[in-house]
């Protein structure tokens, strides 16, 4: 998705969770090469300069069940979730592309959280015609077919196709 976004003229800033980095769920060197920027996963230190420009729009992919529930509840205990809470408060276009199983989807908090985020103006690409949960234990088989392009198209529609974007790559929080 990062390469496709850059090809469309986006200035892409990748934000990963520390759990995603530690678990090997993101290929940091590949993302840095594709975006031309350092992947960020933590708050900057006091006195440290900002490394990324402010975003004009945000894509959250892949959004986990844990993160959708934290985000909807206003929990900002990671750098990525803090940026997402702020993006909603700033009224930025935000597109979220989930990734979780039907077992996790069956929990009432998950659907409630999707509704909360939609009520806040987040375009959650969830349900028929968008992304749908996979069978438990088959997540690894779904990775190659994950619809990254769906998120990029939705962002183009939501933002008018111009600006900067921070992509939150959040598969493990």
What are these language model-derived features?
Residues 1-173:
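A cross-family phosphate/adenosyl-ligand binding-site feature
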